[in-house]
């Protein structure tokens, strides 16, 4: 996943409040339970020296009556919420933390940002497009093609073939227009995936006119449904889950290959050194909610190291100790790398041969590099 949407969180750092709270309201006395949880978090953060204004901003976000999520992750500094995320289940661990950096990794693991994609309902007169971007933004558009002739005549005679050809030409023309809008929309939001429903013939024609990458990644729903229908949304969820799983496995396979050629590293210290050099393309991380690994960091996004001495040698005057995963998240966001959580079966196998000789990357972290040091 790309983390560019988190970049504004790092415009200013220091005294960051990170709160993960169970806000499930389906149980009896839920409001009272939430209030108790938040009071405990408030006391913990106050004791750590958190800014009262920042705590007030978090309290306002958590107490929002319009927010009905089962869990919330809220990040604040200098008296303002900088980012918040709704969880569809209570957080795996309730967290109340004050640190230099926001602790975003649990949010990314439990509620990753949407995969940019398009949902399309094709008709013989055009179609409907729903676009979902990587930060959750969405929009809807309609493509209106030619309205006549779209029906084949059942009347015999010398003109029947001409009417049928005209109708088919109209369908094809409308499919081309819809395909052009789909391709343009995909480019605007960076989508590589499209889910297509609608009229059988219109779906087929649309797929013919899509670009090869979109056509090959398309998932088809064999129903005449609207682009914003529940059926298409559910189909999109299944397809995107399959695509994401396949993508991380293919990229991890590539990492194992690159490791042997100097274009891959594993372990916290080598990965952080690669970030300092601007080398990291893809970071792979074993999802471990219990991790307590730390890193030394500076003000710059790529200022992170396993030891204070390394950062001092790199020119950072006053390194500060913070969570390693918080430092990695910032480095990913600010260097245009991508984050991938490794499926459990890739890091828990007992047979090294099944995983290219590697059952688990050292420290649960590894990276594919844009270039090797030798290659410049």
Predicted regions and their residues:
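Terminal alpha-helical anchor/extension segments at protein ends
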Residues: 1-376
């Amino acid at each position: 996943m790309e983390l560019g949407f988190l970049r504004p969180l790092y415009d200013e750092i220091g005294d960051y409040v990170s709160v993960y709270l169970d806000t499930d309201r389906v149980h009896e006395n839920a409001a009272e339970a939430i209030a108790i949880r938040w009071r405990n978090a408030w006391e913990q953060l106050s004791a750590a020296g958190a800014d009262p204004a920042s705590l007030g901003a978090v309290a306002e976000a958590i107490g929002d009556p319009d927010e009905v999520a089962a869990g919330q992750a809220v990040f604040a500094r200098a008296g303002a919420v900088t980012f918040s995320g709704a969880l569809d289940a209570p957080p795996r661990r309730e967290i109340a933390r004050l640190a230099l950096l926001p602790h975003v990794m649990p949010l990314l693991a439990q509620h990753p940002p949407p995969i940019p994609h398009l949902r399309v309902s094709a008709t013989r007169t055009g179609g409907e497009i729903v676009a979902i971007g990587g930060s959750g933004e969405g929009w809807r558009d309609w493509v209106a093609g030619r309205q006549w002739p779209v029906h084949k005549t059942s009347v015999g005679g010398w003109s029947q073939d001409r009417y049928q050809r005209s109708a088919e030409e109209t369908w094809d023309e409308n499919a081309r227009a819809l395909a052009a809008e789909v391709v343009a929309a995909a480019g605007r939001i960076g989508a590589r995936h499209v889910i297509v429903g609608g009229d059988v013939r219109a779906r087929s024609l649309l797929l013919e006119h899509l670009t090869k990458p979109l056509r090959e990644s398309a998932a088809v729903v064999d129903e005449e449904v609207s682009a914003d229908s529940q059926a298409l949304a559910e189909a999109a969820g299944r397809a995107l889950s399959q695509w994401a799983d396949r993508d991380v496995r293919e990229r991890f396979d590539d990492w194992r290959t690159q490791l042997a050629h100097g274009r891959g590293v594993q372990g916290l210290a080598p990965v952080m050194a690669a970030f300092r050099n601007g080398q990291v393309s893809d970071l792979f991380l074993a999802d471990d909610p219990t991790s307590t690994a730390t890193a030394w960091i500076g003000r710059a996004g790529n200022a992170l190291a396993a030891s204070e001495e390394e950062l001092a040698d790199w020119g950072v005057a006053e390194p500060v100790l913070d969570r390693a995963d918080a430092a990695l998240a910032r480095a990913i966001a600010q260097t245009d790398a991508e984050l991938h959580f490794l499926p459990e079966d890739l890091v828990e196998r007992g047979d090294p041969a099944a995983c290219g000789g590697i059952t688990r990357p050292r420290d649960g972290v590894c990276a594919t590099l844009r270039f090797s040091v030798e290659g410049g």
